[in-house]
């Protein structure tokens, strides 16, 4: 197994143990996304989702795709993820809302095979975790209609500079600790006793979300 494959596997195992995001996770990109969907709608349609086939690749626990399906009942929505435990939560939350226009499938983006194309594909904070980022992109594009929209969000080297420093600091502190569960417990303890002065850039998040900050992603700079 290559180093990139090992990193991707470790991320998969982490999300299996700590499904993300939790139900109360705040989506900072919501307003810009809604504005884009509304501004680019065809004449006579409420937004781009109206009557569209929509895919979220790497949907996790389904927060984004559930909210979109709930907002636009005329669209047909599909969420895929390789993390079974996250999908269980997504399906449960979708069933609670009785969403008939949304389905979930266990799929790996690198081997994506849905047998159809989509008008809109969302891939939010996922592609950079893959062992082969280019193959992942090609897989998404192959499922996109010729006039479709691919909406992505990726890590950036400069934008995550302080967060990366936080990760490195904790990696040094916990270099002799192999248990992810123990690392999370120690991190929570640090967060309870230190201020934002030392732990900055979205690292001082509620404890329910701290697990996501342990991801050692496959890093690319563009």
Predicted segments — roles?
Residues 17, 27-51:
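Conserved alpha-helix/loop element of class I SAM-dependent methyltransferases that forms part
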Residues 61-73:
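Conserved SAM-binding loop of SAM-dependent methyltransferases across substrates and taxa
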Residues 83:
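Conserved SAM/SAH-binding beta-strand->alpha-helix loop
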Residues 98-110:
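Conserved SAM-binding strand-loop segment of SAM-dependent methyltransferases
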Residues 111-120:
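A short acidic, Gly/Pro-enriched loop at the edge of an enzyme's catalytic core
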Residues 134-146:
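A short glycine-rich, Lys/Arg-flanked "PGG" loop and its adjoining helix->strand segment in the class I
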Residues 149-197:
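Conserved class I S-adenosyl-L-methionine
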Residues 221-222:
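Conserved small/polar residues in nucleotide/adenosyl-binding loops
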